[in-house]
C-alpha cells in the first residue's frame, strides 16, 4: 500500500469508512489524445505520480525501466507507467487503448490513453465511446496539426462535450505566453467547424516537469487559470441521458421460479418508478411497473445508468432486445436510418453488403444501401467515395431486416449506438452512431424465409467454394 492511500484510509477512520466515501465520489471518464510524441503517456504518468497513486515497488521498477527504455536521460520516463506493451516501449509510441484508474479527495477518474497514429483511429474511437471529457495534447513547438483536428472531430462525433486543450512541452518554448496565445487562437478558429455546444478550455503545461499538471507553475506567472487536475476535479458533467425520456432495453428475462418473472437490464435514460405505465416495443403492449428489484432490495424509483429488474403487473410476451418506455410516448419504429460509421475492418464497407448489427441488446441484420460521403478527418471536408476503407469515417444509409426503435446517438448513446458484425467470422467490423432515423417502418414482406436465410449463411460459411450469393446483400 502506498503512503498516500494509507493516509487517506487513516483520515477516513478505517477501511470500511474509506470504501463508503469512495462509493459516493463522482466518477469522470476522460481520454488523452494528440499527435505522436505529444506526451500523452507522460501526462498520465505525471498525473499518477503527482497524485501519489504509484506504489513503492512500481516506482523502483520505473527507475530501472527508465534506464533501460527511457527517453528522458537521467529523469524518470513517466510514460513507461502507461505504455505496457513491449512493442510500445520499444517504439516509444502508444498502440492500444490503455486504461488507468486514480482518485483524489474530490473525484474518481478512469483514463483512456489512446493512440495518436491515424492507422489506429479505430482504437481511439473505442476509447472515446465511453468518455465524457477529452484532453487534446498539442506540442507547443508544432501547434495545431491535422491529427489534432482529427481527434477533435472524432471526440465530438462520439458525443464528448468537454474538451481540454493541453498545450504541452511549454518548457521547450521557454514558457512563452505568445506561443500559448497563438495556438489558442488557431484552435478556436478551427473549432468553429465543430458543434457549437462545446465546453473548450486551454491549459499551458509541461508534463515532463509537472508545470500546471497537479500544481501551479512558477515558470508561467502570466497564466492565472486552474491546473489540469483542478479542471478535471471541478468540471461539471451533465449527462444527456438524465434529461432524456425513459428507455429500458431488456437484456435478460429472469424467471428463477413460477412466482417471479422480471426483465433485467440497465436503464439507458430517464427514470422509472413503481406504478408507472409503460409500453413494450415493438409489440406496443402496455402494462404497469409492479416492482423495481435491485441487488440491495426493492426500490420505488430508478435512474439512468442503474442496473435493475422490472416486474410488470401483467404477464406479457417480452424478450431480449425489446424496449420499454413511457406509455404516453409516441416513438415509431423505423426500417432505415442514416448512420455515422467508423469502419474497423481491412475489407472496406461497400453498398450492397449486409451485416449483423447489435444495438441495445438486440441483434438483427442490416443492408448498406449507400455511402453518402466519407469525412476527411484531417480537414473535416466531405468527399464522395465508392466504399469506406479501414479507419474511414462516413455517413452511410442502412436498411434493417426488421423494424427497430432508434434514437439519435447524440440524444441517447445506448439506443443510438450500434456495431457491425461480419456474419461469417462473427468479428466486429465497425461502429455506428445513428445520425437520423429516416423512414417509418413498413410491413413489406420478406422475399426469403428465416430458414432460407439461415441455410444460406451456413452454406456460405462452410462451403465458400460453392460460390453461393448472399441472399440479403445480393453479392
Curated annotation (Swiss-Prot):
Coiled coil: none annotated. Its EC number is 2.7.7.4. One of its GO terms (molecular function) is GTP binding. Residues 92-96 are annotated as: G2. GTP binds at residues 34-41, 113-117, 168-171. Residues 113-116 are annotated as: G3. GO terms for biological process: hydrogen sulfide biosynthetic process; sulfate assimilation. Belongs to the TRAFAC class translation factor GTPase superfamily. Classic translation factor GTPase family. CysN/NodQ subfamily. NCBIfam families: CysN (TIGR02034), PRK05124.1 (NF003478), small_GTP (TIGR00231). This is Sulfate adenylyltransferase subunit 1. The gene is cysN.
Amino acid at each position: 500500500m502506498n503512503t498516500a492511500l494509507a493516509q487517506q484510509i487513516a483520515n477516513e477512520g478505517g477501511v470500511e469508512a474509506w470504501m463508503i466515501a469512495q462509493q459516493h465520489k463522482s466518477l469522470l471518464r476522460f481520454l488523452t489524445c494528440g499527435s505522436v510524441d505529444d506526451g500523452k503517456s507522460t501526462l498520465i504518468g505525471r498525473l499518477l505520480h503527482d497524485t501519489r497513486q504509484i506504489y513503492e515497488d512500481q516506482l523502483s521498477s520505473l527507475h530501472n525501466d527508465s534506464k533501460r527504455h527511457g527517453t528522458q536521460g537521467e529523469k524518470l520516463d513517466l510514460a513507461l507507467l502507461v505504455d505496457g506493451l513491449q512493442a510500445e516501449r520499444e517504439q516509444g509510441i502508444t498502440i492500444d487503448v490503455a486504461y488507468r484508474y486514480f482518485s483524489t479527495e474530490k473525484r474518481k477518474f478512469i483514463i483512456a490513453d489512446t493512440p495518436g497514429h491515424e492507422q489506429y483511429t479505430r482504437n481511439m474511437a473505442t476509447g472515446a465511446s465511453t468518455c465524457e471529457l477529452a484532453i487534446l495534447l498539442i506540442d507547443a513547438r508544432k501547434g495545431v496539426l491535422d491529427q489534432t483536428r482529427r481527434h477533435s472531430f472524432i471526440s465530438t462525433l462520439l458525443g464528448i462535450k468537454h474538451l481540454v486543450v493541453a498545450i504541452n512541452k511549454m518548457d521547450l518554448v521557454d514558457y512563452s505566453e505568445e506561443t500559448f496565445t497563438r495556438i489558442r487562437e488557431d484552435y478556436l478558429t478551427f473549432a468553429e467547424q465543430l458543434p457549437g455546444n462545446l465546453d473548450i478550455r486551454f491549459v499551458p503545461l509541461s508534463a515532463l516537469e509537472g508545470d500546471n499538471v497537479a500544481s501551479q507553475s512558477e515558470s508561467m506567472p502570466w497564466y492565472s487559470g486552474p491546473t489540469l487536475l483542478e479542471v478535471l476535479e471541478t468540471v461539471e458533467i451533465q449527462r444527456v441521458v438524465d434529461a432524456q425520456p425513459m428507455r429500458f432495453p431488456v437484456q435478460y428475462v429472469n424467471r428463477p421460479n413460477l412466482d417471479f418473472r422480471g426483465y433485467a437490464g440497465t436503464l439507458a435514460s430517464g427514470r422509472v418508478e413503481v406504478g408507472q405505465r409503460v409500453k413494450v416495443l415493438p409489440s406496443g403492449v402496455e402494462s404497469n411497473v409492479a416492482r423495481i428489484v435491485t441487488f440491495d432490495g426493492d426500490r420505488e424509483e430508478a435512474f439512468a445508468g442503474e442496473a435493475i429488474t422490472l416486474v410488470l403487473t401483467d404477464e406479457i410476451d417480452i424478450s431480449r432486445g425489446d424496449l420499454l418506455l413511457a406509455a404516453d410516448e409516441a416513438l415509431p419504429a423505423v426500417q432505415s436510418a442514416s448512420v455515422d460509421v467508423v469502419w474497423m475492418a481491412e475489407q472496406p464497407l461497400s453498398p450492397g453488403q449486409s451485416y449483423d448489427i447489435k444495438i441495445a441488446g438486440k441483434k438483427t441484420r442490416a443492408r448498406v444501401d449507400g455511402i453518402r460521403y466519407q469525412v476527411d478527418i484531417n480537414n473535416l471536408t466531405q468527399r464522395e467515395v465508392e466504399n469506406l476503407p479501414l479507419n474511414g469515417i462516413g455517413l452511410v444509409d442502412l436498411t434493417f431486416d426488421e423494424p427497430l426503435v432508434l434514437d439519435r446517438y447524440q440524444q441517447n448513446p445506448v439506443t443510438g449506438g450500434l456495431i457491425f458484425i461480419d456474419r461469417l467470422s462473427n468479428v466486429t467490423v465497425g461502429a455506428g452512431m445513428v445520425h437520423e432515423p429516416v423512414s417509418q417502418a413498413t410491413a413489406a414482406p420478406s422475399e426469403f424465409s428465416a430458414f432460407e436465410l439461415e441455410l444460406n449463411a451456413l452454406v456460405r460459411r462452410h462451403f465458400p467454394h460453392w460460390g453461393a450469393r448472399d441472399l440479403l446483400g445480393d453479392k
